[in-house]
Amino acid sequence: MNDLVVAYKPAIYNLIEEKSREIGFTMPSDLYVGSLLKTLISSKPKSNILELGTGIGLLLSWMIDGMDSESKLITIDNDPTLISIAQDFFGNDHRVSIVCEDGTKWLRTYKGNKFDLVFADAWPGKYSEIDKVLELIKIGGFYVVDDMSAQENWPDEHQKNVDQLIGYLEGREDIFLTKMNWSTGLVIAVKK
C-alpha cells in the first residue's frame, strides 16, 4: 500500500489550492485529512456537519465531496477575506451555510440540531468551548481534530495546549477516542 498517493481529489480542489498560493495563505490543509473527512462523512447519510475554521476551503471541498444530497454543513471562520473566497467557491451549494463569525460566540448561541460530525480546525472547538462542542454531537457522531503533532509554525508553548486537550479528552467517559500519529496528527472521538 502506498498512502502517499491520494486519488480522487475534489474537482474544485486545485482551483482552491491555486487561490491559496495567489493570496499567500500559509495554512493549507493536508490531503490525508481531507480524504479521511470525506470517508467519515460518506458514512453519515442525511447528516448535519459542522466545520470550525473554514480557512480558504480546502478541507471544506473534501467534506462537501463526501456529502449526499440531503446532508447539511455549516462552516464558520472569523476572517472575512477567507469567508468571501469560500463563498465564491461554495456559496451556490444549497447544502452549505458559510458563516463569518467568531466561533466562540457562534457556539455559545447555537440552538439548532445536533451534529453527526464536527471538525474542529480553529481555537474554538479545539482549545476552548470543548464541552459545548461535545454536547452538540449526536450519539455515534464524530469529533475530529487535526494538527496534534508538533509543527514548525507552532508558537512557543503550544504543545501544552495540545497535551491539555488530549488529556481532557482521554478523561471523558462519554466518548471513544483514537489518537493517530498520521498526517498532521489526528484525534477522532465518537460520542457514546
Q: What residue ranges belong to the model's regions?
A:
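A short alpha-helical cap/connector motif
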Residues: 1-117, 124-144, 148-192
